[in-house]
Amino acid sequence: MSIFYLRHKDDTEVIGVSFSQVQADRFGINWRDAYIATLDDLGFRNIRVATYWDRIEKSPSEYDFSELDFMVQEAEKRNAKLKVVVGQKVIRWPECFYPAWLDKNNPGLVAERTNELITETVNRYKNSPAIESWQVENEFLLKTFGECPKQNLTNEALSREIETVRTLDPSRPIELTQSNQNGFPFLGPNTETFGFSMYRVVHNNVFGYYVYPQTGIYNFWKAALIETYRDTRVTIHELQGEAWGSRGNEELSWEEAQRSMSPKQLRDNLTYARQTQIKTMYLWGAEWWYWLKETQGKPEMWETVKNEVAR
């Protein structure tokens, strides 16, 4: 495992962030303003965005990429880099964003139409200098989380999607992802990078608030094993930067939100992540930070993130 340490000890740290217009809409904020502020005020130059199928293809084979066009164009203006999540299972609840016209319980049809969506997306943006990488699906083989028919989430479908992206845009790396609480990814197709999520303090209806027991050193060893076994590079695709409470964050008071996320907890999470020697990490929570600052009079999370990104 010393090879893993030596391989990465001189790597430049990259702190990126995920951004979802769907989540911004839940908070009732202007997602375009929030996205621009994430670029300009927070100073992020690595952003993960997603293709929301139900917003892009509201009618069969009629595509509206205006939202993603805006994000790509604004990133280009600033020399920012985007990781674009493509597929049927992407970021934010309910994970799978099937259009109303699609029979989501027909795995063959879903697989075919997913590949058509991926093809349209990759061909549209592969010539943009803002696109750094493609993430194919999001924690795709985690079948216990999200409102997705389990029969659609197969290795065969995933492998086909990866091959589609690789054929259309062979020059860019592809990333797969997994929840950190779900073992080691010994099965499944290989890609150039592999991301796992990292959450620290969460809530469920059985235990209430609790801290995940995995240590930073545990994740160092896990990352080393993944890189060795799968011949890939490991990233943290979701580092907890927002509250995980008993209700949606738009319904949590600031007092309750701080039970799982606060400025101190954010700094602690970054320290924890750095113990792994994984140098590329994407924070989770940009829409919440903006909502707190703009509508709740609570700029503390926003300012903490700004200071960390500027380090």
Where are the language model's segments positioned?
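Glycoside hydrolase catalytic-domain groove-lining segments
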Residues: 155, 167-250, 300-303
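Hydrophobic faces of well-ordered beta-strands that scaffold small-molecule active sites
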Residues: 13-19, 47-49, 82-86, 132-136, ...
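Aromatic-lined substrate-binding rim segments of carbohydrate-active enzymes
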Residues: 32-97, 102, 148-175, 189
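Boundary/entry segment of secreted carbohydrate-active catalytic domains
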Residues: 2-45, 50
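Short, acidic/polar
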Residues: 25-41, 114-124, 178-187, 262-272
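Acidic (Asp/Glu)-rich catalytic clusters
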Residues: 7-10, 34-43, 69-79, 122-129, ...
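Active-site cleft segment of glycoside hydrolase catalytic domains centered on the general acid/base Glu
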Residues: 60, 95-171, 185-189, 204, ...
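Substrate-binding cleft of secreted/luminal carbohydrate-active enzymes
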Residues: 233-310
